[in-house]
Regions:
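Core catalytic lobe of class I
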Residues: 1-244
Length: 244
């Protein structure tokens, strides 16, 4: 978890912090804890959350995290409740996730996370589809069944996409921009050339994933490209604000 801090001391992150407006730098804090109980984070203090919640196949890595899909959803309900508490009014929480195939069964993770977040007070603002390169996966045993049995009813596609779910706590007060120093407001402007050239304005983003290369420090950790949080931070936060 990443929140505003200075030399290990927590700061008030309920509003843009004037101490960082001059240098436009970033301050980082890592908390090893449980997202179901984020007591370290003040209420209404987070301006943007970008997270990849535990995938439903996480028990392969964390066998005690949940025993079945109902327990998985219970975990997400607890996380959603805490996220609603720590999120400032009008601000955004983003989840990168997708439906999951486990032991031959497909689970509707995207729709269930959406329902859980709405039930915990968030508005469902939008969904962006993250498409990975076609070369990310070759024909697998799943999709390759058609090669062995080229008949109807044998089709199971390989997945090269995930969903970026965007939720909002209430409505954003756009008069907030008037309260920001001009330097902060102008420094937070979105690069329109990049916005147009890389098609940020579409509901489909083509972004190369991080390959799980042998010897990588992150081996075994979800391949999560930095480009996704970079875009979301640019689109949904201002300089001096707090990102979780």
């Amino acid at each position: 978890m990443l929140i505003g801090a200075e030399d290990g001391v927590e700061i008030d992150v309920s509003k843009p912090d004037e101490r960082w407006w001059g240098e436009m730098g970033t301050v980082h804090k890592i908390i090893f804890g449980d997202c179901r109980d984020m007591r370290e984070i003040p209420s209404n203090s987070i301006h943007l959350t970008v997270a990849s919640p535990p995938y439903y196949n996480a028990p392969f890595d964390y066998p005690d995290l949940f025993k079945n899909y109902d327990e998985f959803l219970d975990l997400l309900r607890n996380v959603a409740g805490e996220l609603h508490r720590v999120t400032a009014d009008g601000r955004i929480a983003c989840f990168v996730t997708d439906d999951m195939l486990v032991e031959g069964n497909k689970y509707p993770v995207v729709s269930d996370i959406t329902r859980v977040m709405v039930e915990n007070g968030f508005r469902y603002r939008d969904r962006v589809v993250w498409v990975k390169p076609r070369g990310y996966t070759r024909i697998s045993r799943r999709s390759g069944v058609v090669l062995q049995h080229p008949y109807p009813m044998y089709f199971y596609p390989d997945n090269i996409q995930e969903s970026i779910l965007i939720f909002q706590k209430g409505r954003f007060d756009y008069h907030y921009l008037e309260k920001l120093p001009r330097k902060v407001r102008e420094g937070s402007k979105i690069n329109l050339k990049e916005y147009n050239d890389d098609s940020w304005y579409l509901s489909v983003w083509n972004i190369t994933n991080v390959l799980p290369l042998e010897g990588r420090l992150e081996k075994g950790i979800a391949a999560f490209p930095e480009e996704i949080p970079r875009r979301l931070i640019k689109l949904f936060s201002f300089i001096g604000e707090t990102v979780l």
